[in-house]
């Protein structure tokens, strides 16, 4: 070994090594001595004198793998990486499936957020290879696209053709990654979701509890029930019965919360969640009980009270309940689109005659925030928003911008659907103002007329 290292050092000193050889030597010395090796630094110094634009695809791959092995050397070679990214974009059309997945994996592990042009180019190339990726390669590709927050409709189309052919046979983690990708990107594909739902019924016993959760959660997030929903959730219930103690507390909470988003009520298991033993487990696990976890617990509790009157299990103790589901960052409600809200507000002032006749961003006693609340008396007249007595009817306007829907279809996300469902049960009249209707209105007069037809369809409009 000493003679081999000595000989390599001599050839390195003489400058006889090409890029591929330098990469091989760098990998070997990283394994022997780590990233602080003097010889590795010498290798990198010689590589930096080269012009990446002149490298072959094989040399480019070797260099990416070297940098990945040392996790980018803590950002010391940003200029080199950027030059490599620029060159890689020009040769993606020559990349096979293994190279595409490998490079996306490298970009992910090095967190190359500045390399989006390359990520986009690799995604386009991946479309041609979707049917040819191995399970491991496809999982890498999907993981990278989730990491960088990218997808395009050509890739989605290719996945819709491929998933029905692989859902029953691919590695469980690959199938799980498919569902995670569509869920993370808010892409509702009935073709994909139905195929995975069918395979879930037959394969769920071989899945880990984490895989079960990650396959079920997108159904709740996107508010979609497959045709075989009864079989799917019966299988979920069976797994919960047989492997309840195997679930991590947060994972279990995510599964049960996803169920209620699509009106599946796991009553037998919710009672266990509200036990002091489970809540103690939640506190002891990792991040403990953060505000999002408390919101999930509170919404589960509200669901039991509103939709499951036959629930007789323990109550959620008051110290675990929150007052608002609308929180910064990860939230059980999507904040109102400000531009859309301002346009609706302007129309409401003209319709109702004054700003005082409706409340904005009103926190209800039931944790949900109302975009707009209008109060009516017994005769149907609008009351000032400040009135609390003589209120006979409450109207909640849901000003639904694009972020409240799946990215490719006009379907509300699960968290928005449950909000509107609960508000109806609590006595509110729900009136939706979807962006795709409102955006068609061309002037203030049409806005006011639209709002009048939505809110007061059976009454004449007064002119102020």
Describe each region flagged by the PLM:
Residues 1-464:
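Eukaryotic RNA-binding helical-repeat scaffolds
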